[in-house]
């Protein structure tokens, strides 16, 4: 008869099983291999700039394992020595939110978008406007746009001249605003003229119908009068019998 496992063997089995499933400390992973890396870069290896920029752009998070640091990208994980220069730079960049998914794009956008902080002072009563500030604002606005968009720059400059200058920044721009307003009124007037022109055929048609109805009424009245007069003549006519001739 076979004897089962004793208490000592069962205890040793549970002890080794607990060692295999023991979780790691923080982000270091576990002994079972939760710090698995798809690609491990040996220490002292020179990283190409293109590869490093790719990692900065698509970095999601990183984990501090026991002897290395694992960087989790979108499709794979890359591990490197914790003492390597590129590893420390990448960790520092991600911790300061200067790279990674969602961080690097906003940082790149803030880096390339110019900040226009120039403001135009409002004109006060009794004080002439500061033309130097207006010229400085115009030059700043022109330098903000790239050289490949001249039409947009011209449209914005024209809009700035027609909206800001007529409010008291220059008398020379008032005729331009008045001409624009006059042109706007002229554009509205053809619409009213078109409505009047559309009513003319309708009125003409109504007049023609009225004259036709009047002519038909006159014709019917004339026919009735003619019939009545002919019947009256028949009533007034009395036939006369011929007298008998004497023998």
Swiss-Prot record:
Residues 1-26 form the signal peptide. Residues 120-152 are annotated as: Disordered. Induction: By interleukin-18 and the induction is strongly mediated by an activator protein-1-dependent pathway. Residues 131-147 have a biased composition (Low complexity). This is C-X-C motif chemokine 16. It comes from Rattus norvegicus (Rat). GO terms for biological process: cellular response to lipopolysaccharide; positive regulation of cell growth; positive regulation of cell migration; receptor-mediated endocytosis; response to cytokine; response to tumor necrosis factor; response to type II interferon; T cell chemotaxis. Belongs to the intercrine alpha (chemokine CxC) family. It is found in: Membrane. InterPro entries: CXCL16, CXCL16_dom. It is a single-pass type I membrane protein. Induces a strong chemotactic response. Induces calcium mobilization. Binds to CXCR6/Bonzo. Also acts as a scavenger receptor on macrophages, which specifically binds to OxLDL (oxidized low density lipoprotein), suggesting that it may be involved in pathophysiology such as atherogenesis. It comes from the Eukaryota. The gene is Cxcl16. The lineage of its organism: Eukaryota, Metazoa, Chordata, Craniata, Vertebrata. GO terms for cellular component: extracellular space; membrane. Residues 27-198 are extracellular. Disulfide bonds join 35-65, 37-79.
